[in-house]
């Protein structure tokens, strides 16, 4: 099923956030990083920018607690735009769906939005850090891409390409080569967004660009950096622009 969403302008403004790692205790720290205030600061920044659509690319909760997903749901409702969320390896997918699987969250895996298609993929594996799409989902993706030639954005949690960081490449998308083979036959795939790496990266393969996004939680290789997110502007002709934003959280106090 394809869900249609009509925005107000020709340019589609998207915000991508990832790897929030929210905890049941909003004051608790993960690897020395108090994750909840950082995520709250990013949502405050997003409210000032009013994106048309929010993409959340996994690891939304660290502990899978109902309180963490309820907090996330409340922030998205306050933001006031539709949102597409996928699970990362730290998430509890069933709980994510139960708590966040209703408006403003959009529940279908394929969306038609202002001349673009957005397809959300599931790379989650129970009790695994690495990811896998599996053959049935790859076959499904191949079929979906074959039915519409509109410019397409794909989102998954695990990077499907090697990013040059040994520890991260070892826990990326295990069937990345098979995924790349599928999309190589569909030149309308313009963007592939991922999380998991806790850093921004960009790679190009043919007409497809692969983009990584910094975390709202800690950045693995540069822990001194603040919370980050990615903005994208998509045009109906398939062109796009993107920018990384950093949000200073030093003065943020979350209660």
Swiss-Prot record:
UniProt remark on cofactor binding: Binds 2 Fe(2+) ions per subunit.
Residues involved in Fe cation 2 binding: 59, 89, 157, 196
Pfam families per the UniProt record, alphabetical: Metallophos
GO molecular function: 3',5'-cyclic-AMP phosphodiesterase activity; metal ion binding; nucleotide binding
Class of enzymatic activity (EC top level): hydrolase
Residues of the signal peptide: none
Ligand binding (AMP): 21, 59, 89-90, 198
Keywords tagged on the record: Hydrolase, Iron, Metal-binding, Nucleotide-binding
Keyword Nucleotide-binding: yes
Family: Belongs to the cyclic nucleotide phosphodiesterase class-III family.
Protein name: Probable cyclic nucleotide phosphodiesterase syc0937_d
Protein species of origin: Synechococcus sp. (strain ATCC 27144 / PCC 6301 / SAUG 1402/1)
Organism lineage: Bacteria, Bacillati, Cyanobacteriota, Cyanophyceae, Synechococcales
């Amino acid at each position: 099923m394809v869900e249609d969403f009509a925005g107000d302008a020709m340019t589609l403004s998207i915000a991508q956030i990832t790897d929030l790692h929210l905890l049941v205790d909003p004051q608790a720290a993960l690897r020395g990083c108090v994750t909840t205030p950082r995520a709250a600061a990013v949502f405050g920044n997003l409210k000032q920018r009013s994106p048309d659509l929010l993409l959340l690319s996994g690891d939304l909760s660290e502990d899978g607690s109902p309180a963490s997903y309820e907090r996330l749901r409340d922030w998205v409702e306050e933001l006031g735009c539709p949102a597409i969320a996928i699970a990362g390896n730290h998430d509890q997918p069933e709980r994510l769906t139960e708590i966040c699987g209703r408006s403003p969250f959009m529940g279908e895996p394929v969306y038609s939005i202002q001349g673009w298609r957005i397809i959300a993929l599931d790379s989650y594996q129970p009790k695994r850090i690495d990811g896998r799409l599996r053959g049935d989902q790859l076959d499904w993706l191949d079929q979906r891409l074959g039915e519409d030639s509109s410019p397409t954005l794909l989102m998954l949690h695990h990077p499907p390409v090697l990013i040059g960081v040994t520890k991260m490449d070892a826990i990326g998308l295990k069937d990345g080569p098979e995924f790349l083979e599928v999309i190589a036959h569909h030149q309308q795939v313009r963007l592939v967004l991922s999380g998991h790496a806790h850093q921004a990266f960009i790679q190009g393969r043919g007409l497809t660009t692969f983009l990584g996004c910094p975390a709202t939680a800690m950045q693995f290789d540069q822990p001194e950096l603040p919370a980050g997110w990615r903005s994208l502007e998509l045009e109906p002709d398939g062109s796009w622009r993107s920018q990384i934003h950093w949000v200073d959280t030093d003065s943020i106090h979350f209660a």
